[in-house]
Amino acid sequence: MMRVPVENLGLFEQLDRIVVAFFRKQQSSSPYDLYVSITQEHVDQKKQELEPLGYQAVKLPLGMALDNVIQQAHFKALIIGGLAPEEIIVSKEALMPMKDIVDSFCIMYAAANNRLENGKAYELMKDKTVYFIGKLLTDSLKKGDEISYMGIERESADGTSYEAVKCFLTKESAEQYNDAKRPVSHANLAYLKAFWGNPVIIEPHRNYWIEFK
């Protein structure tokens, strides 16, 4: 088993990847590690090893497996199999900096799969920080800075087009779509929506995108 810095694992890029996690069927009185399998070979190996010990295999997105380890007291670490020749162990503490991002992903994923109403999703996300390509009117503006945002053309149900503000969960995610190398800024989601007076769309290039009008 090996330890790898969490920032080197690229977990954010794989949040919606379907994995197999092994949960105990009975509630445990002592904390245990959550095993997650990325490959079928590792799934088969872990089933043979863990099912006789009272574990069951559950398919879910990697982001939800991370959320379980972060939020639930009875998990002490995440063990990932299939990413490298050896299993990789990541402690709960190492995952904590991802807590807000993982929480946002779970909300967005549930809404994208019609398990959460858009309005409820907004209530859960409105106080979160998001990133956008551009600048707001702030004290940190320098001469030559432009108050602007990068938008995306959208089409409403009646066929009319409108523009939504592109937002992202991380600065690194925003930079992937920032070919013009404009400033990347962060802001409270509700404030950003009110400031521009436009709909916002979060992670528009991913399968779990969400839009708030």
List each model region and its residues.
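An interfacial alpha-helical scaffold signature
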Residues: 1-213
